[in-house]
UniProtKB/Swiss-Prot annotation:
GO biological process: symbiont entry into host cell; viral penetration into host nucleus
Organism: Influenza A virus (strain A/Kiev/59/1979 H1N1)
Cleaved signal peptide residues: none
GO CC, alphabetical: helical viral capsid; host cell; host cell nucleus; ribonucleoprotein complex; viral nucleocapsid
Full protein name: Nucleoprotein
Stretches with biased composition (Basic and acidic residues): 8-21
Record note on modification: Late in virus-infected cells, may be cleaved from a 56-kDa protein to a 53-kDa protein by a cellular caspase. This cleavage might be a marker for the onset of apoptosis in infected cells or have a specific function in virus host interaction.
């Protein structure tokens, strides 16, 4: 899949590059990281943050959000045209946390968007550096994927909450470009398409006129992105049907939900990249490390090495467990919300627990939370091994899975069998095999029935010691199969609310 001539690598998507060789890609990704780091250093100076305050992940999130908001042209235009009380469309800001008299204080800051844009461009040699902005969006998206379970969003579009392993990138903004499209899960794409079709059903003019033409081309583009994620001919043929439909309606919604379900067993190709918070890149750049010169990759050892040598802190609420908070952020850093927990435990070198067993809420602190009782602690983001990120769904096989999440979407290219609960998945495929997609549906169901438990994915791939930078000695892990593999197992994670 990944080697097809027409596909561009992540790094090329990430840097809007033409075809580049590996060294050029590493350099352009490094340049992007340098820019984020320089911007972060400058913002810390502007805000007079101490070294410790600058390494606080909550401050990092606020600063990242400010620059994303400053460059959100569509929203900025909307705010200009629809002024709302108490919101200045030209300003952006958020909470900054400072240590005052041995206590954490919250300070709300406000900056001109124009000023933030100037600082960002200056840090990026005068460019808009969209790649760096997208990188931060993907980090926020990965953090959301790890923190929240999108049950309500799934139910609203007629899907099943147990399909949460397909929802990677579901909170990414539309403007996240090719790099954003690459990391979106099958369920996310299906959900976007269903929302679009529903609007068309409810609004007669949605597909008509000058705007309708734009809408239609957006619809077809999204269909093609989703089609490109599927690995079997029958799934792709069904996507062609959905794309070519004259007047998309309930039949297409049915087909899309069918395809989403099928992806629990016949998994789609979804890219994974380790996107770290700006407060990791800042101090590294400040210490004199030259990412552009040294080169950097989001899918290799580099993020692991960087995290081995980084100090990041987080605010901790009174009844939260700092180790659990660390796990949450570690998983987000490696885009691993839907990976098999047994593999994650092996790579991290400490047990990785399901979301429902973690005593921690999200990383962000709401404006009404009491600061008097806030402590802070170091996030443990180091790992025992490293592994190469995958952009394929791996092949498929079967194993006992859980009430909550019934499949995984692999993050790391490491040999194992991929758990999914075949009986639960297949139970959803009763009945409807008539209609124009019947032969494709039958073919897809047959492939799912044939998926074998013993089949191994990523055969021969292993994890590597952190000293093994060239990935010469793969260590193939062995797993205790009696353990639970799903992160959102019978889960009670909070809902994501915009």
């Amino acid at each position: 899949m990944a080697s097809q001539g027409t596909k561009r690598s992540y790094e090329q998507m990430e840097t809007d590059g033409e075809r580049q060789n590996a060294t050029e890609i590493r350099a352009s990704v490094g340049k992007m990281i340098d820019g984020i780091g320089r911007f972060y250093i400058q913002m810390c100076t502007e805000l007079k943050l101490s070294d410790y305050e600058g390494r606080l992940i909550q401050n990092s999130l606020t600063i990242e959000r400010m620059v994303l908001s400053a460059f959100d042209e569509r929203r900025n235009r909307y705010l200009e045209e629809h002024p709302s009380a108490g919101k200045d469309p030209k300003k952006t800001g958020g909470p900054i946390y400072k240590r005052v008299d041995r206590k954490w204080m919250r300070e709300l800051i406000l900056y001109d968007k124009e000023e933030i844009r100037r600082i960002w461009r200056q840090a990026n040699n005068g460019d808009d550096a969209t790649a760096g902005l997208t990188h931060m969006m993907i980090w926020h998206s990965n953090l959301n994927d790890t923190t929240y379970q999108r049950t309500r969003a799934l139910v609203r579009t007629g899907m099943d909450p147990r399909m949460c392993s397909l929802m990677q990138g579901s909170t990414l903004p539309r403007r996240s470009g090719a790099a954003g499209a690459a990391v979106k899960g099958v369920g996310t794409m299906v959900m976007e398409l269903i929302r679009m079709i529903k609007r068309g059903i409810n609004d007669r003019n949605f597909w008509r006129g000058e705007n309708g033409r734009k809408t239609r081309s957006a619809y077809e583009r999204m269909c093609n992105i989703l089609k490109g994620k599927f690995q079997t001919a029958a799934q792709r043929a069904m996507m062609d049907q959905v794309r070519e439909s004259r007047n998309p309606g309930n039949a297409e919604i049915e087909d899309l939900i069918f395809l989403a379900r099928s992806a629990l067993i016949l998994r789609g190709s979804v890219a994974h990249k380790s996107c770290l918070p700006a407060c990791v890149y800042g101090p590294a750049v400040a210490s004199g490390y030259d990412f552009e010169k040294e080169g950097y990759s989001l899918v290799g050892i580099d993020p692991f090495k960087l995290l081995q040598n980084s100090q990041v802190y987080s605010l901790i609420r009174p009844n939260e467990n700092p180790a659990h908070k660390s796990q949450l952020v570690w998983m987000a850093c490696h885009s691993a919300a839907f990976e098999d927990l047994r593999l994650l435990s092996f790579i991290r070198g400490t047990k990785v627990s399901p979301r429902g067993k973690l005593s921690t809420r999200g990383v962000q602190i709401a404006s009404n939370e009491n600061m008097d009782t806030m402590e802070s602690s170091t996030l443990e983001l180091r790992s025992r091994y490293w592994a190469i990120r995958t952009r394929s769904g791996g092949n498929t096989n079967q194993q006992r899975a859980s009430a909550g999440q019934i499949s995984v979407q692999p993050t790391f290219s490491v040999q194992r069998n991929l758990p999914f609960d075949k009986s639960t998945v297949m139970a959803a495929f009763t009945g409807n095999t008539e209609g124009r997609t019947s032969d494709m549906r039958a073919e897809i169901i047959r492939m799912m029935e044939d998926a074998k438990p013993e089949e191994v994915s990523f055969r021969g791939r292993g994890v590597f010691e952190l000293s093994d930078e060239k990935a010469t000695n793969p260590i193939v892990p062995s797993f205790d199969m009696s353990n639970e593999g799903s992160y959102f197992f019978g889960d009670n994670a909070e809902e994501y609310d915009n």
